Amino acid sequence: MDIGKKHVIPKSQYRRKRREFFHNEDREENLNQHQDKQNIDNTTSKKADKQIHKDSIDKHERFKNSLSSHLEQRNRDVNENKAEESKSNQDSKSAYNRDHYLTDDVSKKQNSLDSVDQDTVKSKYYEQNSEATLSTKSTDKVESTEMRKLSSDKNKVGHEEQHVLSKPSEHDKETRIDSESSRTDSDSSMQTEKIKKDSSDGNKSSNLKSEVISDKSNTVPKLSESDDEVNNQKPLTLPEEQKLKRQQSQNEQTKTYTYGDSEQNDKSNHENDLSHHIPSISDDKDNVMRENHIVDDNPDNDINTPSLSKTDDDRKLDEKIHVEDKHKQNADSSETVGYQSQSTASHRSTEKRNISINDHDKLNGQKTNTKTSANNNQKKATSKLNKGRATNNNYSDILKKFWMMYWPKLVILMGIIILIVILNAIFNNVNKNDRMNDNNDADAQKYTTTMKNANNTVKSVVTVENETSKDSSLPKDKASQDEVGSGVVYKKSGDTLYIVTNAHVVGDKENQKITFSNNKSVVGKVLGKDKWSDLAVVKATSSDSSVKEIAIGDSNNLVLGEPILVVGNPLGVDFKGTVTEGIISGLNRNVPIDFDKDNKYDMLMKAFQIDASVNPGNSGGAVVNREGKLIGVVAAKISMPNVENMSFAIPVNEVQKIVKDLETKGKIDYPDVGVKMKNIASLNSFERQAVKLPGKVKNGVVVDQVDNNGLADQSGLKKGDVITELDGKLLEDDLRFRQIIFSHKDDLKSITAKIYRDGKEKEINIKLK
């Protein structure tokens, strides 16, 4: 966000600061308004609005000015800190170079002194008498053994100190890195006090203290003389310094431990004895160097790392070595010159130790400076850590403020998300269940319409068989067609079954074989039959619970095209329980039936037409609707060439009327008017002229014979009368005349007939009782 004067800050930070600034100003304004309690006049509302808008603009300007001044002050502070850090870095670099050159000069002087002492000892030792050497060999071995123990103990202590000093730590690394930037002039006084304190603590031994004080006057001027040379030298890089130190250490080892390999065997023994003393001298020097400054090939170890101050054990060890050296000088002064040289070497090693101690005091001052710089660096690191923690605290405070400001909205948002997820899961499960239910409903509906009704109906349909009597006058081929048929259990009373079938199925036999769907059979008795309706009732007894009574429907409510099922036993028992499906093809059909098989129709059967497959053996079978209720009984089919699926069933309402009388009476009483008739369609021209029939009359019947004292005779009918209408219905032939008369079998009321007599039309009432 650009706020002017080349200051750019993040937009979120700008908004946050602006919000805080405005909040503080608004709070102050509210306090002032609360104190003043000034009333605002309604007439000056427009002016007040303009002033408010102007105040808001001024408020933004004040915020930008305050923010820009704050950022400028922060930039100035940053630049001042950078300048101070660069200045401190330069001071530390110069101090580092000065200390580095001083340390190198001291190490060079020590190396040169070591080489001179070792050459002197060797030359004097080899000039001594061989006999004196042999006489003192045993004593030398004892003393050398003691010296080895002392030197080994001292080496262990030195190695432990070296291990501690050479181990790099994170604090040392930070001290070496940040020491250059933390030196200031104020540290010089502290370094001086530290040097005095360390020198006083490190020289508690009276003997060593006197020697050190006596030698300081000799060594310090030499170091001061070499300061000019050190300052004139060019600073070395870190790899060059490491290489130089490695070469110096190799030279020391070569000068200290190598002697002539071409000497005689007896001299080699003395050299070995001498080597037990020379390593002690070198060990003293190495320990002093190890205390002062550790040089390691590892580049991680800094060459300027100062050692720790001498411990009490080191000082005691030095005192023991000093006492032993004096003891050797007193014991060997009268025997051999070798021991004198050895005491001289020991004395010089003591001087070297004193010089090293003096140098050690100076290095302790450097150590004090290093510790001071380390403390400063630690303070800086602590301040950085505190800044980081403060930043983290700021972030946490921002998050807390954000949560406190918007937690209701966040909770509502989370609740909405959870609610959406739950509702989605619920709706998915509901839709899945709905799809499953739809599939199940579809399967159940399919089973209900096609199979359930069929399975229930099969339990109510039986096979009816009769045996034609041997003396039957009917031809065998015609009688054989009626030997096997079907029946329907329309009523069940306990173990008693009432079965309806066709009259032409039972024939003239009183007993019938009834076979159920489970292949069990019983013998049934014919209660009654009616050839004009082609119906019969058979009574049977069975305790089989699998046989069920069929449900009765209503044939007056049939609909054209209504689906139906036909259940029967075509061709006998082998194919019992056959189910065929179809529809109602026609209603109110009048089907001529030839009962006695004389090729002459005997009766018009009132039926409805179906297109389901019907075969011989289906006669008397059940026709059920989509609800599984009985709506008709199969009665006939048309068996003609090129004619298919034209079958007929007697409506169940007509069946109920017939079977009721057959159960009680065993027969049906029809009215008989006592006449014989001929169809007009069958008359020839002479017969038409004889009865004086008008030419327009094409259909009707001619009375051919009237019984004396019959209903027709009582009604006034005479031979030669032509009947064209009966009971208000057009009369086609004698089958229709019988059908109309039989339809009034229950009421037996008189009916009106329209006749032609002697060519004249007239009406008469025909009595039915």
UniProtKB/Swiss-Prot annotation:
Gene Ontology annotations for the cellular component aspect, listed alphabetically = plasma membrane
| Top EC class, one word | hydrolase
Query: Where's the PDZ domain?
Result: 680-733
Tell me which SMART domains the record gives.
Answer: PDZ
Task: Say where the protein is mainly found.
Answer: membrane
Q: Where is the composition biased (Polar residues)?
A: 126-137, 247-262, 331-347, 365-390
Q: What is this protein called?
A: Serine protease HtrA-like
